């Protein structure tokens, strides 16, 4: 049965001489792998390579032949749903986008339907595309916190004089500096709490910090996810994020 859905490209792999296998995060079916036959072939009439539309992070409208429990699905049609202005061109925006996509690949199991997380990711990438690069510093932390919350690993509480620490194992702000609550310094705990309370991405730039504190918070968040999920492994894009976002 053919169905139309929105999709975000997570990964592409060459298959044969002219085809691709694409891993897509779809609105209706979660993460699925699709075979696109002949997409790398340059046609005589079009003189274009449609594989160029399938860059990592691309937002698509696709018509798919979906068969439950099949490991490799088939795409019948696809087109661009949103044309980026800077995400695939500007180094800072592209670095943040690639980090977000890699995090999704690490966290999302195949075929797990996550409609709310899909909608959030779609909006995150579009907002990122319209944001000045010098205002993106808190975006990776915000995206990581949001992914954790959508997948059921939300951190409870906020920073206060009564709860100045945060426990990585209990996922909560706490009054006690015991065990793993000392893993994040006070500046980091305050930054994490402030970003958690943001109601929109547009206000993230109002939260002032420095690159070292942001680095410590992002490292802490990834350690948090490693402890609370079975899917997290080393993030290849992490070192690039730290070097690009000052």
Spans of model-derived segments:
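Non-catalytic alpha-helical scaffolds and adjoining flexible linkers that form interface surfaces
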Residues: 1-246
């Amino acid at each position: 049965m053919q169905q139309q859905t929105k999709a975000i490209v997570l990964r592409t792999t060459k298959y044969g001489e002219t085809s691709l296998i694409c891993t897509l995060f779809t609105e209706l079916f979660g993460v699925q792998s699709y075979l696109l036959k002949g997409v790398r072939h340059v046609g005589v009439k079009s003189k274009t390579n449609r594989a160029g539309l399938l860059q990592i992070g691309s937002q698509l409208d696709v018509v798919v032949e979906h068969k439950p429990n099949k490991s490799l699905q088939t795409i019948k049609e696809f087109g661009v749903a949103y044309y980026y202005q800077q995400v695939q061109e500007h180094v800072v925006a592209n670095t943040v986008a690639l980090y977000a996509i890699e995090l999704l690949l690490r966290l999302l199991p195949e075929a797990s339907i996550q409609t709310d997380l899909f909608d959030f990711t779609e909006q995150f990438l579009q907002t990122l595309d319209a944001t000045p690069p010098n205002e993106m510093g808190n975006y990776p932390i915000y995206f990581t916190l949001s992914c954790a919350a959508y997948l059921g690993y939300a951190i409870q509480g906020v920073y206060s004089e009564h709860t100045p620490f945060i426990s990585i194992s209990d996922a909560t702000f706490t009054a006690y500096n015991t065990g793993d609550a000392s893993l994040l310094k006070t500046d980091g705990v305050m930054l994490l709490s402030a970003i958690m309370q943001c109601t929109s991405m547009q206000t993230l730039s109002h939260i002032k910090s420095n690159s070292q504190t942001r680095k410590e918070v992002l490292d802490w968040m990834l350690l948090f996810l490693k402890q609370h999920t079975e899917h997290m492994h080393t993030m290849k894009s992490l070192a690039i994020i730290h070097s690009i976002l000052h």
